[in-house]
Amino acid sequence: QCDRRQRQMCIRDSLKDIGKLASSLGYKAVQIPTWDKRIFDLDKAGSSKDYCDEVKGILKEQGLEISELSTHLQGQLVASHPAYDLMFDVFAPENLHGNVKERTKWAIEQMNNAINASNHLGISPMASFSGALLFHTFYPWPQRPTGLVEEGFKELAKRWKPILNHADSKGVDICYEIHPGEDLHDGVTFERFLKATNNHSRAKILYDPSHFVLQQLDYLQFIDFYKDYIKMFHVKDAEFNPTGKAGVYGGYLDWKDRPGRFRSPGDGQVDFKSIFSKLSQYDFEGWAVLEWECCIKSPEQGAK
């Protein structure tokens, strides 16, 4: 549903319209989500370079490039714990709801189509989520059985290695957004995944400092540690203001009431000047992609 202030944003439901808006606001590229056929037909893009050239042409008319493709929702469904199956069903076609085996198969096919599409578009980095087999156990109570974490990452790697291998054959890097709710949610878990995949050369990082603010991780030192793996960058701000009632876990509060919440760039606590300095220092060659989820301002304000 769109209220008055959002209506002008909501009616832009075609790639051409979105491109016009982005160009008018000074953007140079767009990151395309791959789960909405009104914008991008992933099945067609995976099999047809002509279709991909057509999409590039639509945006080129507006003076825009495609920065990357996003496969967050499909990646999430590559690995899902049963505790989340009902909530994650909405990411898949309705005919797959309640059928985890077929849903997972669909997600893997989608990932491979997106890899093919990225190759057709001439784009190396591709955004995704790792999915989560273990995240429900991140707090050690009840105590985790010995070996559970190792087995979990072994299974996660088993699911992703064929996809990573396909990505390698197409010259595509899968950039996992390090994100709460995913098994890859900090540097330690990314390293666990790397080890489980035998340091697969196509396993990379989508760096988003907002998620590190919310879990109180040093987002600047993270760049020092993982500079060689960071191939994508989301510009998203956040703030963390703990109280005597709630902290990192948030107390099940709505976003606007949580101690940790996303904000528009400049309204939060992220030191973007230092981030851009570090990324430049390490010769980061990717795009700075605005991702907006502010709980206070409107989408139109965020786009501007």
Task: Kindly label every feature range from the protein language model.
Residues T34-R38, T71-G75, S130-L134, I178-E182, ...:
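Active-site-proximal loop/turn and secondary-structure-junction residues that shape catalytic pockets
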Residues Q1-I11:
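Single conserved hydrophobic/aromatic residue that forms the stacking wall/gate
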Residues K16-D17, L21, E61, V78-K204:
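Active-site acidic/histidine proton-transfer and metal-coordination neighborhood
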Residues V30-I32, I66-T71, I123-G131, D173-E177, ...:
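Short beta-strand segments at enzyme active-site cores
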Residues P33-K60, G75, S130-F138:
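Glycine-rich, proline-tolerant flexible connector loops at the mouths of alpha/beta enzymes
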Residues R12-A22, V55, K105-A117, L214-F225, ...:
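Short, acidic/polar
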Residues P299-K304:
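C-terminal helical cap(s) of enzyme catalytic domains, especially alpha/beta-barrels
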Residues D17-G19, A29-V30, L69, V149-Q269:
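Acidic/histidine-rich catalytic cores of soluble enzymes
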